[in-house]
Swiss-Prot record:
The gene is mt-cyb. The cytochrome bc1 complex contains 3 respiratory subunits (MT-CYB, CYC1 and UQCRFS1), 2 core proteins (UQCRC1 and UQCRC2) and probably 6 low-molecular weight proteins. GO terms for biological process: mitochondrial electron transport, ubiquinol to cytochrome c. It is a multi-pass membrane protein. GO terms for cellular component: mitochondrial inner membrane; respiratory chain complex III. The keyword Membrane applies. A ubiquinone binds at H201. Its cofactor is heme b. This is Cytochrome b. CDD domains: cytochrome_b_C, Cytochrome_b_N. It comes from the Eukaryota. Binds 2 heme b groups non-covalently. It comes from Zenopsis nebulosa (Mirror dory). It is found in: Mitochondrion inner membrane.
């Protein structure tokens, strides 16, 4: 008689996705980040749920309700620290996951990749509205600056901004709706994650060589279930270490000052995981141009499958494109650094050069090098 997990309508789905799933035998630790992102998402939803039980989305009490959570609620400080730092780990895993996809050509699974880009945008939106909720100085001014960018939209810009604000400035209506969005978006992310998963399992996983691996598959359990478990332990170890020993390392000190519309902080900057996009936004001296560049910096990922020119899938056997990939990684790091710096010489020039290089790599250099490598292969 067949096992229950193979016959039960619900368990069969779990079995086909997590137990008897045929996986390439040679996928490396870079393939762990999908499950780590799942862990981050579950952690964020659970800690967020407990925070929402004590938080009040009102300008008069939001800041003090967060202080109350940290001081008076049982383990409230821990829940808040894990939620705040969990967001950073979410983005670390996200960037590594995207980097893996770019390096090994996983973007050629177009549906999976495009849903992934939409997920990336949604996670960014969720993190942005979440950062506004403690109603500190950086929360308020970050919300003001970023929502104000929508005023650059021709004709409807000003109306759009006031519609999002729910008034003539960032105020109580804005905070309340941002809390509603912050609660809603993670569940949309869960739904899209299921779709992401579904499309991935239509094709099966890619592998480091980029070669079809149908001839060499192993069951997901026990091989990759234990491998993923090891990744989960490392992630939880790193997250708990940061949350216990240095919970405010990645935060902004200005956010410990209650929001004051009359006093602007000396440097308005978002959390570290948005700095590369913020640097691209600031590198263009025109408002609409900056907004378009900001959008393009993320949406350019959707063009990657179209711009793939190489006959090989991944970069494992393509040293020239490998070099460009690592230049791209360094460029994103430089943009992240510039995004956190004041707008003055020499940071302006460095930011502009790095922004131009970012788009040039994606649109010109990497596709051209792929074509060149094809030619070199033909010569042999």
């Amino acid at each position: 008689m067949a096992s229950l997990r193979k016959t039960h309508p619900l368990l069969k789905i779990v079995n086909d996705a997590l137990i008897d799933l045929p996986a390439p035998s040679n996928i490396s630790a870079w393939w762990n980040f999908g499950s780590l992102l799942g862990l981050c998402l579950v952690t964020q939803i659970l800690t967020g749920l407990f925070l929402a039980m004590h938080y009040t989305s009102d300008v008069a009490t939001a800041f003090s309700s967060v202080a109350h959570i940290c001081r008076d609620v049982n383990y409230g400080w821990l829940i808040r620290n894990i939620h705040a730092n969990g967001a950073s780990f979410f983005f670390i895993c996200l960037y590594l996951h995207i980097g893996r996809g770019l390096y090994y050509g996983s973007y050629l699974y177009k549906e999976t990749w495009n849903i992934g880009v939409v997920l990336f945008l949604l996670v960014m939106m969720t993190a942005f509205v979440g950062y506004v909720l403690p109603w500190g100085q950086m929360s308020f001014w970050g919300a003001t600056v970023i929502t104000n960018l929508l005023s650059a939209v021709p004709y409807v810009g000003d109306t759009l901004v006031q519609w999002i604000w729910g008034g003539f400035s960032v105020d109580n209506a804005t905070l309340t709706r941002f809390f509603a969005f912050h609660f809603l978006f993670p569940f949309i992310i869960v739904a899209l994650t299921v779709l992401h998963f579904f499309f991935l399992h239509e094709t099966g996983s890619n592998n480091p060589t980029g070669i079809n691996s149908d001839a060499d598959k192993v069951p997901f359990h026990p091989y990759f279930s234990y491998k993923d478990l090891f990744g989960l332990v490392l992630l939880l170890l790193a997250l708990s270490s940061l949350s216990f020993f240095s919970p405010n390392l990645l935060g902004d000190p200005d956010n410990f000052i209650p929001a004051n519309p009359l006093v602007t902080p000396p440097h308005i900057k978002p959390e570290w995981y948005f700095l590369f996009a913020y640097a691209i936004l600031r590198s263009i001296p025109n408002k609409l141009g900056g907004v378009l560049a900001l959008l393009a910096s993320i949406l350019i990922l959707m063009l990657v499958p179209i711009l793939h020119t190489s006959k090989q899938r991944g970069l494992m056997f393509r040293p020239l494109t490998q070099l460009l990939f690592w230049i791209l990684v360094a460029d994103v790091m430089i943009l992240t650094w510039i995004g956190g710096m004041p707008v003055e010489h020499p940071f302006i020039a460095v930011g502009q050069i790095a922004s131009v290089l970012y788009f040039t790599l994606f649109l010109i250099l990497i596709p051209t090098t792929g074509w060149l490598e094809n030619k070199i292969l033909e010569w042999n």
